[in-house]
Amino acid sequence: MDHLPIFCQLRDRDCLLVGGGDVAERKARLLLEAGARLTVNALAFIPQFTVWANEGMLTLVEGAFEESLLDGCWLAIAATDDDAVNQQVSEAAESRRIFCNVVDAPKAASFIMPSIIDRSPLMVAVSSGGTSPVLARLLREKLESLLPQHLGQVAHYAGQLRARVKKQFATMGERRRFWEKLFINDRLAQSLANADAKAVSEITEQMLSEPLDHRGEVVLVGAGPGDAGLLTLKGLQQIQQADVVVYDRLVSDDIMNLVRRDADRVFVGKRAGYHCVPQEEINQILLREAQKGRRVVRLKGGDPFIFGRGGEELETLCHAGIPFSVVPGITAASGCSAYSGVPLTHRDYAQSVRLVTGHLKTGGELDWENLAAEKQTLVFYMGLNQAATIQEKLIAFGMQADMPVALVENGTAVKQRVVSGVLAQLGELAKQVESPALIIVGRVVALRDKLNWFSNH
């Protein structure tokens, strides 16, 4: 280990920054955020330093560096574009046993500054020891995506609860289980982020009052249309915290590969060799797993509240008093249209878009007259088996037979396939496509020839 990672308490302590340019500004921001009493020395300063000085946030000393500026300092940073000046600052600091960082010259410095993920009071530092700053930055960006923005608020709140938790739970094991439940409670984290004191109090009291083994919850997560890159950051965080993931066939293998390795996986979709699990049975699976005290993720393709029956599942949980939350996903209409070069709205062709289910409960009927109106785009979910009926009804209610249509199979996936034509051909076109597929009807489909980008990659 070439460097010892430490966190310095600089609040109200004198620090010196030598340099007045853009690089020095970035260092100054970090020192000010840490509460340092900062003096900045340079021959000239960019405007931001003057702004800070006028606000009383730091002291500017214009002119050449002098060793006396280090008097009383705890820490120094040399951030000029003059190597000789930087070396002078480093040597002067070294002689006084003051730690000094020299920008872009780790061998000349007595300390280096890592890439930082700030979720105060939680801090994560990443460093390559100065050998590969770009690698450290890329790793920091990866970690940033995995750590929720509100994590710091959760950590701060946990600090307020420590004494009470220690008093209520006698053993270390009980305390550990409680803290694990608290740190992955998405409803609590969201309430803290929203400064909803009432909800925070209610959730906390519920967690403290119930037996530890009976504090399960369900998170309804939209997996997006297929491409794993379209899964939201919050969705990724949830599937990596799950004890059990209940999923269907619209969730891609690439997304399932991101699920926490030791999580149980329950498949409830329809696949060759399997029977489709009835919705009521799915509801009971969610209920049963949550009642075991487990963190359950119900992972659904697209967005769970757009033809995903998410509302029905949550009604069951609500009736049973099971805590739940929802993470929306990119719905298939948005993903498939974007990846097939079909804008759902366009000033010249469509001022509205309608998302329509291709099948209803028994006895249901669509409002075909309004669906056949001009200047709109129709997107039919689960409509492949009803394509001939959709064609017949739309034409019967006045839509032109030459209206452009597109069928998007496996939208956003590497194996995406798009079949296009006109409304009069829809029934026949559907025979060329396999589920899962989406039907898009509207003048905007004609733009596909110009705007299609995905198939070219």
Curated annotation (Swiss-Prot):
The keyword ATP-binding does not apply. NAD(+) binds at residues 22-23, 43-44. Its EC number is 2.1.1.107, 1.3.1.76, 4.99.1.4. InterPro entries: 4pyrrol_Mease, 4pyrrol_Methylase_sf, 4pyrrole_Mease_sub1, 4pyrrole_Mease_sub2, CobA/CysG_C, NAD(P)-bd_dom_sf, Siro_Cobalamin_biosynth, Sirohaem_synt_dimer_dom_sf. S-adenosyl-L-methionine binds at residues 225, 301-303, 306, 331-332, 382, 411. Pathway: Cofactor biosynthesis; adenosylcobalamin biosynthesis; precorrin-2 from uroporphyrinogen III: step 1/1; Cofactor biosynthesis; adenosylcobalamin biosynthesis; sirohydrochlorin from precorrin-2: step 1/1; Porphyrin-containing compound metabolism; siroheme biosynthesis; precorrin-2 from uroporphyrinogen III: step 1/1; Porphyrin-containing compound metabolism; siroheme biosynthesis; siroheme from sirohydrochlorin: step 1/1. Residues 1-204 are annotated as: Precorrin-2 dehydrogenase /sirohydrochlorin ferrochelatase. The keyword RNA-binding does not apply. The active site is at residues 248, 270. It catalyses: uroporphyrinogen III + 2 S-adenosyl-L-methionine = precorrin-2 + 2 S-adenosyl-L-homocysteine + H(+); precorrin-2 + NAD(+) = sirohydrochlorin + NADH + 2 H(+); siroheme + 2 H(+) = sirohydrochlorin + Fe(2+). Residues 216-457 are annotated as: Uroporphyrinogen-III C-methyltransferase. PROSITE patterns: SUMT_1, SUMT_2. GO terms for biological process: cobalamin biosynthetic process; methylation; siroheme biosynthetic process. Keywords: Cobalamin biosynthesis, Lyase, Methyltransferase, Multifunctional enzyme, NAD, Oxidoreductase, Phosphoprotein, Porphyrin biosynthesis, S-adenosyl-L-methionine, Transferase. The modification Phosphoserine is found at residue 128. One of its GO terms (molecular function) is NAD binding. Pfam families: CysG_dimeriser (PF10414), NAD_binding_7 (PF13241), Sirohm_synth_M (PF14824), TP_methylase (PF00590). CDD domains: SUMT (cd11642). Then it catalyzes the NAD-dependent ring dehydrogenation of precorrin-2 to yield sirohydrochlorin. Finally, it catalyzes the ferrochelation of sirohydrochlorin to yield siroheme. In the N-terminal section; belongs to the precorrin-2 dehydrogenase / sirohydrochlorin ferrochelatase family. In the C-terminal section; belongs to the precorrin methyltransferase family. This is Siroheme synthase. It comes from Citrobacter koseri (strain ATCC BAA-895 / CDC 4225-83 / SGSC4696). The gene is cysG.
